[in-house]
């Protein structure tokens, strides 16, 4: 939950739990689901159809039970922040519609007992490094 060194370390050590049931029945029709998907995209400032997002906003109340009224998420429930432009399952309309329609089961087991503190620390450093821009190659002197 988050990209800080401590957050990465906690995710590796303690695991993560994020289960979202299919919500199509609660949201409504296929058009309602697509409108909610446009609203979800609007929360992160991503490209979306503003008129469809406006229609989806009231239906987002179903989603707000876990994601919050502003879409900021709830770590205890495993509901991700929808405002941060971090998309684990694709950021397009079709990917979001699929998540609303089919749900998701995103569980990561805890690894602290298996790896131990030192290896969790090293793995967290490695994962953090994956999110950093690669440094420019150092110039080498000619022969």
Where are these regions (language model features)?
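Extracytoplasmic electron-transfer domains, predominantly the class I c-type cytochrome c fold
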Residues: 1-45, 74-132
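Sequence/structural segment immediately N-terminal to covalent heme-attachment motifs in c-type
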Residues: 48-73, 84, 97, 101-102, ...
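Extended amphipathic alpha-helical coiled-coil/heptad-repeat regions
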Residues: 134-138
């Amino acid at each position: 939950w988050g990209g800080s060194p401590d957050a990465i370390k906690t995710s590796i050590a303690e695991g993560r739990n994020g289960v979202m049931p299919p919500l199509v029945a609660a949201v409504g029709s296929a058009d309602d689901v697509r409108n909610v998907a446009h609203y979800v995209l609007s929360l992160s400032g991503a490209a979306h159809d503003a008129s469809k997002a406006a229609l989806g906003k009231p239906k987002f109340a179903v989603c707000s039970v876990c994601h919050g009224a502003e879409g900021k998420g709830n770590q205890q429930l495993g509901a991700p922040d929808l405002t941060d432009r971090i998309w684990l399952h694709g950021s397009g309309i079709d990917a979001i519609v699929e998540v609303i329609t089919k749900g998701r089961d995103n569980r990561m087991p805890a690894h602290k007992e298996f790896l131990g503190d030192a290896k969790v620390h090293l793995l967290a450093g490695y994962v953090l490094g994956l999110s950093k821009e690669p440094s420019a190659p150092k110039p080498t002197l000619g022969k």
